[in-house]
Amino acid sequence: MPRIIKKEDIQCHQQIPGFQIKSVTEALNQDSRLMEVKRLILDPNIISPEFTHTDIDQLLYVIKGDGIAKVNSTEFPLDKESILWLESGEKYHFISGNLGLEILQATAL
């Protein structure tokens, strides 16, 4: 059944000042065994923590802003509507630019 998820329904799991993780899947109040979707929000000029997902691939879509995704030791420039695919086991983090960075992260479980 289709559902609209409002911004105010999405809870924030803040990791460090200037960086937020918001779970869209949790806002639905249901456990999805197939997919998890999160919004990653970085204020301007912030370095996110490093992440590694050892058992899932991910699709990352830049909603707005600019910055860099550093995957292993390679830097990938990001701007609005960039799409980045990460395979399981890759280490990555984000560096937001002057506009900040907002990313939609989708993983198939």
Give the location of each predicted region.
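Short, conserved beta-strand element in jelly-roll/cupin
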Residues: 41-42, 52-69
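A short hydrophobic beta-strand segment most commonly corresponding to one strand
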Residues: 39, 85, 99-109
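Short beta-strand His + acidic residue motifs that chelate non-heme Fe in jelly-roll/DSBH
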Residues: 49-50, 69-70, 86, 91-98
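A cytosolic small-molecule/anion-sensing beta-strand core signal
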Residues: 38, 63-64, 79-80
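A short, N-terminal "cap"/entry segment at the start of jelly-roll beta-barrel domains
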Residues: 1-34, 49
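Short acidic-glycine-tyrosine-enriched beta hairpin
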Residues: 73-88
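Conserved short histidine dyad/triad with adjacent acidic residue
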Residues: 25, 36-54
